[in-house]
Amino acid sequence: MDMMQFQRQTTQLAMTQRMQESLRILQMSNADLADYLTAQALENPCLEVRVPEGASVAPALPSRGIQAGLDRDAFATVEGQPPSLLAHVEAQIDLAFFDPGDRRTALAFAEALEPSGWLGQPVSEVAAAAEVEEEEALVILERLQALEPAGLFARSLAECLALQLEDLGLLTWELRTMLDHLPLLAEGRIADLARRCDCEPEHIRENLALIRSLSPKPGEAFAADRTPIQPPDVRVLRGPEGWEVELTRAQLPRIRVSEAGDTGDRQADAWLARARSQARWLERAVERRQATLLRTAVCLVRHQADFLDQGPRALRPLSMEEVALELDLHPSTISRATATRLIETPRGLIPLRAFFSRSVSSDGPEAPQSQDALMALVREIIAREDRTKPFSDDAIVKQAKLAGAVLARRTVTKYRETLGIPSSYDRKRAAAAA
């Protein structure tokens, strides 16, 4: 290998490492970024970092859960601290499981959760504890895996990641194949994976970036001691001309690059030059992080302003791909920018990803609607029914039409079952028994 080729490969390797580091920085919370930069400053005399002293933390609220029956109108500022993982899950179970037997089994699964959010016991053991058949327990588990945050109740890392990708509407055959071969990913065997997926290695690398943006332990967003994990990175306020988005700069570490002069020692000066170059790169990487996060949040708020004004019924269909296209970024960049982040709103703290919502084709000539909004509507209609005369699915279709939503009966049935709401017959029987 000649010197020119060696230098070219060395430069490419350095660029790849910096790209990976830049992606890591993008995904860090403000607190993680402060820790990271502080550690870098200890090793780099040209990097000065000022970390703000403890700032106030806004009260946290449950994460996105319309699909599991959690009404986002409940996102209102509350006193106190965020719930533990168990409390968060139990709150969703109370809303999603009407049948007492199903709820008992669901709570048994909740008790088996590890702090990571993974299921800590075999399904057979949970079924035995709940005194139900294993097949019945598996049905309940599938419903629990639709709760938020996505990835809870997984039995393996691959399943945890697959649940998150499915929730985002991004789970392709290629990604599923990659998750089925995680050891190859860990070993960096890109070529082998490309052959198995019948695609180019570059496509594997793009998918790998998306996988790395996911949370392997979604339960860690909650604390057993009920203390906030992290403050919001972004806030949205109502201004004179509409909603205004800003970064929570009180939480942001400040960087300064020292321009110390030469020492007169060739080796020392060369080392200082490299340190100064690294410090400047870190400064630019943090600036890019802030700009990407702010642009993404502004785009989300612009598209979902009605959600902030009116609540979950006003959510519009919006995907990561649409936002990425609008901002001229890769979807994996949007995924990283929004992963685990909270935005402070007049409704309280909300996961930034709550602003995404899957599109559902209308059963009529109307434009596609948000699945979350339609499911919220179905739940709202059922919540206000006369318990002794519950609405049938056909009646819900008529009520939805009065609210301006065109739904087929089969769609109502699907949403009702996803929400864990029994049929009108079973609801009437339960009301009579009560």
Swiss-Prot record:
GO molecular function, one term: DNA-binding transcription activator activity
PROSITE patterns in the record: SIGMA54_1, SIGMA54_2, SIGMA54_3
InterPro entries documented for this protein: RNA_pol_sigma_54, RNA_pol_sigma_54_core-bd, RNA_pol_sigma_54_DNA-bd, RpoN_core-bd_sf
Origin superkingdom: Bacteria
Motif RPON box, residue numbers: 408-416
Record's keyword terms, sorted: DNA-binding, DNA-directed RNA polymerase, Nitrogen fixation, Nucleotidyltransferase, Sigma factor, Transcription, Transcription regulation, Transferase
Gene Ontology terms: biological process: DNA-templated transcription initiation; nitrogen fixation
Presence of keyword Transferase: yes
DNA-binding region: 319-338
Any one Gene Ontology cellular component term annotated for this protein: DNA-directed RNA polymerase complex
Record's keyword annotation contains Aminoacyl-tRNA synthetase: no
Family recorded in the similarity comment: Belongs to the sigma-54 factor family.
Cited function: Sigma factors are initiation factors that promote the attachment of RNA polymerase to specific initiation sites and are then released. This sigma factor is responsible for the expression of the nitrogen fixation genes. The open complex (sigma-54 and core RNA polymerase) serves as the receptor for receipt of the melting signal from the remotely bound activator protein NifA for the expression of the nitrogen fixation proteins.
Name of the protein in question: RNA polymerase sigma-54 factor
Organism of provenance: Cereibacter sphaeroides
Gene expressing this chain: rpoN
